[in-house]
Regions:
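Mixed-charge interfacial surface used for oligomerization/domain docking
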Residues: 1, 7-165
Length: 165
């Protein structure tokens, strides 16, 4: 059976890991399908980009918009939870964009399976420390983005994936 997880990167990885565990424990196909559908509905993915340059190169935005956004230091804030890329806002500095991610996490209530995803973000460990009041540091996974997502997101992209309760 094919199930659309509406997820990517570590969000998808969490679903696969839990489904594999259920299969290993002897879960039936129906039980595993129900588990995957439940996890998919509870998976959240948010990210912030550090530059608009890669969006311009990939044809996702025009040159004028990229130039203006770069001049104003816009950092796009994205919600990928629905399986589509949705602009959830924009911030003017890196610090504000990371604070936006923290506010998203704080607004969710109880969360689990938190992963930080990044593309060579030098401040990833600092960000992990900042959110350790929300999820203990030893429960936070940090993962480098793959080539495809990293190509679109560009250097210093940083995001979070997690499950809501």
């Amino acid at each position: 059976k094919c199930i659309d997880s509406k997820s990517i990167t570590c969000g998808l990885g969490t679903i696969i890991r839990k489904a594999a565990g259920a299969a290993k424990d002897g879960g039936s196909m129906d039980e595993i399908v129900a588990l995957v559908e439940n996890l998919a509905s509870r998976t959240r993915i948010f990210a912030t980009l550090d530059t608009l340059e890669n969006l311009k190169k990939g044809g996702r935005i025009g040159g004028a918009k990229a130039m203006l956004g770069t001049m104003l230091q816009f950092k796009p804030c994205l919600d990928l939870s629905s399986g589509e890329v949705v602009e959830a806002g924009r911030q003017r500095t890196r610090k504000k964009s990371l604070n936006w991610l923290i506010e998203v996490l704080e607004s969710e209530g109880e969360i689990s399976e938190l992963s930080i995803i990044h593309g060579d973000a030098p401040d990833v460990e600092e960000f992990a420390t900042l959110i350790s009041d929300i999820v203990p540091r030893d429960q936070i996974r940090i993962n480098q983005l793959g080539a495809v997502i990293g190509t679109h997101g560009g250097p210093r992209v940083l995001g979070v994936t997690y499950l809501v309760q």
